[in-house]
Amino acid sequence: DRLGNEGQIQLVLPSLLAELSVLEAGPVNRSNTDFPIALSAGERRDYTANTIYRDFGWRRKDPDGSLRISPEDAATIGVETGDQARITTLVGSALARVEVTDRMMPGHAAIPNGFGLDNDDGTRSGVAPNELTSLGDCDKFAGTPHHKFVPARIEAVA
């Protein structure tokens, strides 16, 4: 079936052709008034590669895997770098230390992968991205959760 009349391989997959029309419509806005922030749950940072997380020396600058947000969102929410904030998604909630940075666009936030694990001393550092990510909100072909766009709400913690 993959060889055409000219003896060339046919790469067109009919099951995917209909999906291409979605691209013409432009970006999908998955945020809403209850969850206005696009959370990247599992941002790759230079010190979160797999189990490097367990070596505290690698993460001296950011021991808790901070929640990165834009200055605009920080002002709206009422938080500054070092403050605690609550991240809430459809499936979970967690506390995180805030890092305000112009590396984040307004309406977007990020937490790193490799955190939320229990330490040998019984403490827990950072947020486990999977606890905020819905298994019901997945890519329809691959079946993987949309870790890079989790609708979320962020609130200041007094």
Language-model region placement:
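Long, low-complexity segments enriched in small/aliphatic residues
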Residues: D1-G57
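Long, contiguous, secondary-structure-rich segments that constitute the structural scaffold
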Residues: D55-R68, E72-A158
